[in-house]
Amino acid sequence: MEIMLDDGAYMPSRGHRTDAGLDLRTPKAVTVPAYGSAIVDTGVHVALPHGCAGLLVSKSGLNVRHDITSTGLIDEGYTGSIVVKLYNHGGEDHEFEAGDKVTQLVVIPVVCEPLERVSAFNATERGDNGFGSTGR
């Protein structure tokens, strides 16, 4: 996958060869206030493979240890810098230094089927049974 970096940006990397997510880092120090949010421009540009999208997914360690979450969607044709919004669900400010990991990019295949309006769906075993319908 082709990657371009703005000045000061860090090359995405995997912690282990088989990790699904590519770690993205902040090029600048940033504070995410308690119960607040902050926007980080990673300076990373990607040319996603045809038929794929990129999901920005929280780093599990940041989520579990520091209550920091993130999410986002990068469409195949987007080549601008990846920007992520970090949410702090905890009661203390969280400081990131330049070079710290802030989120991870997971590249996934996407099916883009044409839409067709219908008046009813074919019957399925589950139907429209939702929350709690399968029991405990």
Where are these regions (language model features)?
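DUTPase catalytic domain/fold
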Residues: 1-136
